[in-house]
């Protein structure tokens, strides 16, 4: 009853990965926010600000800001409150549709681990292994358990993707949902191994033996880690305009940081002239 005779059925969508693929697309922004407000609040005002790439020049509300270590109270939860639904709304549906099997599910695991590490970088311990999607409250994983669980999930995903890539399996039905590498799943293996290496570096002081093991596994892997600029991950998702361009030029709310201009200028790095425009005042030059 009340069924479109010309539309696809749920069975049709499962067969060509349309249902799981569309959910994968919804998870990718958790790694790099393309929507303008989410990008500004998370990637720019937290990641790029504290990473020494940009600084905010606008003031909001009480005049607080991340660069003064005094953001508005309501901003403290932004990374958690925005990213967790982006991960798990799609993840649990993919797990249900795939019964926790197949490449789409393992792809979702890679995205889940990458996004969870971003959240943990901000807050420390977070819910991970105990999340069910049906409970109002969830126990947090300790930092030790969190990283062990993320390593386990990532290792399983790497093994599944690597087996398929090396066997030359047809993964074309997933290509159209890939906003990062356009269906080049060898690059997704490199991404996952590089993520594994980054995680190992994160825990190198707290768990040096585990860090050494995981770092060596990532580098020694048959497909390996990112080693060339062509391996770089770039999300093509946005809401009509590059959000960094929008905030810098349409909204006039950010400028380049003195940190990055000092380092790039000090080392005569050729990327400086690509990243930064010459100052229009005080004799020009690259001024952060």
Where are these regions (language model features)?
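Membrane-proximal, proline-rich intrinsically disordered regions
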Residues: 1-55, 82
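Structured, solvent-exposed acidic/aromatic patches
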Residues: 17-18, 56-111, 115-288
């Amino acid at each position: 009853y009340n069924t479109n005779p010309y539309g696809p059925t749920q069975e049709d969508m499962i067969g060509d990965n349309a249902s799981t693929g569309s959910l994968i697309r919804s998870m990718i922004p958790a790694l790099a926010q393309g929507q303008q407000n989410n990008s500004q609040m998370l990637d720019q005002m937290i990641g790029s600000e504290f990473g020494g790439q940009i600084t905010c020049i606008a003031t909001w509300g009480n005049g607080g800001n991340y660069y003064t270590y005094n953001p508005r109270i309501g901003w403290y939860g932004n990374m958690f409150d925005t990213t967790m639904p982006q991960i798990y709304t799609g993840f649990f549906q993919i797990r249900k549709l795939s019964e926790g099997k197949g490449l789409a599910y393992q792809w979702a695991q890679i995205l889940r681990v990458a996004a969870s590490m971003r959240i943990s970088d901000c807050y420390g311990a977070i819910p991970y292994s105990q999340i069910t999607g049906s409970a109002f409250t969830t126990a947090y994983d300790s930092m030790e358990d969190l990283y062990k669980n993320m390593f386990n999930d990532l290792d399983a995903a790497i093994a599944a993707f690597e087996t398929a890539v090396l066997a030359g399996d047809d993964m074309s039905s997933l290509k159209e949902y890939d906003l990062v590498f356009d269906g080049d799943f060898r690059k997704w293996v490199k991404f996952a191994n590089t993520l594994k290496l980054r995680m190992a570096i994160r825990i190198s002081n707290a768990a040096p033996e585990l860090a050494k093991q995981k770092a060596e596994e990532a580098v020694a892997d048959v497909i390996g880690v990112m080693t060339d600029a062509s391996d770089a991950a770039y999300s093509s998702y946005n809401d009509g305009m590059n959000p960094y361009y929008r905030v810098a030029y349409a909204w006039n709310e950010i400028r380049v940081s003195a940190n990055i201009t000092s380092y790039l200028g000090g080392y005569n790095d050729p990327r400086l002239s690509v990243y930064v425009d010459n100052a229009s005042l005080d004799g020009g030059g690259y001024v952060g």
